[in-house]
Amino acid sequence: MSEKEKVEGYVEHIIFRNEENGYTVLNLSMKGRELTCVGTLPMIGEGELIEASGDYIEHAAYGKQFRIESYETKVPQDSVALERYLGSGAIKGVGAALAARIVRRFGDDTLRIIEEEPERLAEVKGISERKAREIAQQVAEKAEMQNAMIFLSGYGIALNLGAKIYQQYGDNVYRILKENPYKMAEDIAGVGFRTADEIAGKIGIAVDSEFRIKSGLSYVLNQATAEGHVYLPEPVLLRRGQELLGVEPERMQKSLQDMAIDKKAVIRELPAEREGDEPLRIVYASQYYYLELSTARMLHELNITCEEDREAIEKRIGKIEKKYQIELDEMQKTAVVEAAYSGLMILTGGPGTGKTTTINAMIHYFEAEGLDIFLAAPTGRAAKRRTEATGCEACTIHRLLELTGNVDDSSANVHFERNADNPLDADVIIIDEMSMVDIHLMHALLSAIVPGTRLVLVGDQNQLPSVGPGSVLRDLIRSECFPIVCLTHIFRQASQSDIVVNAHKIHNGEEVILDNKSKDFFFLKRYDVNVIWKVLVTLVSQKLPRYVDARPQDIQILTPMRKGALGVENLNQILQKYLNPPAPDKAERENGGNILREGDKVMQIRNNYQMEWEIRGINGIVAERGMGVFNGDLGMIRSINPYTEVITVEFEEGKFADYTFKQADELELAYATTIHKAQGSEYPAVVIPLLGGPRMLMTRNLLYTAVTRARKCVTIVGSDVTFQAMIGNHIEANRYTTLARRIREMQEENA
């Protein structure tokens, strides 16, 4: 490793500072010359003398800069330096004139006077005894902060993280790090178990420390939620804990009991599945146990029926059919009756089974009754599709609940204006694409609905489950506690679409004929990766846009995997090269080894509840503002400004959001996306490359989800053997949830 460069000088001017992450651009005055320095430097103030280590870099727009990796504040050694430091603005209430008077009075002894005899500052004209104490306190606080940063950097803690730690703990940072560094994983965003564990190892915390085991088990439980689980069976938790911590299960069990006593975990038992077996102990992170319990309770409270006679409802439905020239089959009529009669009902069905017609009939029915209806879906794309299909304005669930900026990065701590204290003012709420709704969002939605409101949940249970924890739609169906109508009849118009017909064949495990006689379902047999790449580029850039009358950016490539020759990462680099090549008039930005370029199709890859957006009208006038950009949202890079270091992205629904260069890691190219990321979306045409992959991944419902994303055309490129094998593979990853059980228990308790 090459030795770092060192520079020393006075901080002449802070050019820019991001108050959220501490990223700073400053001018450093160094014996007759100035140097632009950059880095995460939240604590540095103008006038300070620093010695910094780092590297010289060349910025495309601003030229030569020095990137600071670590620094040390130097004590000013002479009167000129002291006056410069005190008058820089670093000490609140001390300007240049007052600084000059202080140094004139005490000379090179100024800092010692401030630290040891602060009352003597009152000898200077313009300084009261109170102000003298305030000046001394500020100097002491800055010194303490710098000492803490040096202490933290000694354990390999980066400046930006060190600043967060100090802001959280202040002077207690020394005690906390030496006693229980794992507390940081609980208290500070950005410090996970692995970071805390690395620091603990340097400090010398024992491998079998109680603090370490508890923090490790909490980490395992939280990681499980990222896989969609709400709890873990105790044997699974202990096995994963042992792999992480290298500690015997017996030692972990004691810590687990202590976590339950401290209300950090909840331990319950599930009855044995077979006679003679022991009950299964399961473990939740506390918040998820109570989240499920509360969700079950609210669902039970909504599950009431109206006093009206079913026959009267059916007569009114007949009038609706006649007025709007709708012809409902028996199951569709049953669905509308249940929606009118029940506090909560579930409507499911695959493509072409008439869900949209049924929803339209429900809307007409409720409108005729003079009821206020809200229509929502988990994503902007799904909401837009529902608006177009019904003529009734739909929005995202986050927008319906009025997301505010009073949140942190965790979906568990999102704040909505609409909640139990300020519920939604609606008579009927219809939620589409329910398979995408996780336990967090479901709980937030139910919290904002008062009993007596009708809730209609619409979805396809055969789609992939939500990205977040839980399996809400399936659990509601499994509970058998709510009216459920499953539409299975494929209507004549839909039956003419091979997309619909083949989707149902895939779901039923039936063979799909690949003879390419279809008008909307094609299979191009190709077995060489290089050939497949060329075919994908040709399809997206030339053939499909003309065939389905759409722009190339509206054609979506969906692939099962992120890695590999046909994975998202590789395909996006290839597609970007052909679909949006570099040009002199296109600004670009390096981002984690990839390039983001003006005109690129991009996707938001994590929920950012604090990201501000605006919808712009004619001449750029702002028509609406809001907050929140979510995992899976698609957009186009409209501009990259190297001077302000801002990337502007236009998302669907005309939302413009500005990303700092530091936030660019929230975006990735989206010419190709995983099938999982396409949940709830629909495209004019999709292209699916299939050549092989792990059996646990290449499943029937993954293929079903991919095919049902297309509105006009599906083209699969690759191996027909892989395609047919996926149809035959009905393995589904089991999610550990107990919502269905909680709902049944709630029903039994209140029977």
Could you describe each region identified by the protein language model?
Residues 461-627, 746:
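Conserved helicase motor core of P-loop NTPases
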Residues 508, 624-626, 631-751:
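C-terminal accessory regions
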Residues 3-18, 54, 634-638:
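Structural detector for short beta-strands of small beta-barrel domains
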Residues 273-428, 477, 483-492, 499-523:
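ASCE P-loop NTPase motor cores of helicases and related translocases
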Residues 23-32, 36-37, 45-273, 278-280, ...:
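Accessory alpha-helical DNA-binding modules that contact the DNA backbone or grooves
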Residues 433, 459:
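Walker B catalytic acidic pair
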Residues 17-27, 643-649:
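Short aromatic-glycine-enriched beta-strand elements
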